[in-house]
């Protein structure tokens, strides 16, 4: 039976190929930084801390536009690379931790309110909930769902 994901060596080659084809993207390859971006607060749990200790992405990429994001996703699919989306990593259950390596997509560059009118707000996935709350309150509205980490948590992370 074929493994669903490439092994570590195949992933390294695939990541290098994707990086070479998309040099305009903001890449992070330094091992300590990649490790940090591959973690949430799962280490609060001694069980998850042990289970996820060695798990991390092979690279982190921060796209700045939808076009860059589309190109990145297409390249990862073409190479069979796992792809994980990262908001602010405020969760504590290990949902963001890459189990099979791959590319971590830092969505922090997607942090704008696109449209706001009475009772409706459309925003990008990387915007912090605190910013949405501030903008909503200025117009007499408020968020209906307020996690304890709302000042740091992102819209995309809340709904993923």
State where each predicted segment sits:
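N-terminal flexible segment immediately upstream of the FAD-binding catalytic core
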Residues: 1-74, 90-119, 148
């Amino acid at each position: 039976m074929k493994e669903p994901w490439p092994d570590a060596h195949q992933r390294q080659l695939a990541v290098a190929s994707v990086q070479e084809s998309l040099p305009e993207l903001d890449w992070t390859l330094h091992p300590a930084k990649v490790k940090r971006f591959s973690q949430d607060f799962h280490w609060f749990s001694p069980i998850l801390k042990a289970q996820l200790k060695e798990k991390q992405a092979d690279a982190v990429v921060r796209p700045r536009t939808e076009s860059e994001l589309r190109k990145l996703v297409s390249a990862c699919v073409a190479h069979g690379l796992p792809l994980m989306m990262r908001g602010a990593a405020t969760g504590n259950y290990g949902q963001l931790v890459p189990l099979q390596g791959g590319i971590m997509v830092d969505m922090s560059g997607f942090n704008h309110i696109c449209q706001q009118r009475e009772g409706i707000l459309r925003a990008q996935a990387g915007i912090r909930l605190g910013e949405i709350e501030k903008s909503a309150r200025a117009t007499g509205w408020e968020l209906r769902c307020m996690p304890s980490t709302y000042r740091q948590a992102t819209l995309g992370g809340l709904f993923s």
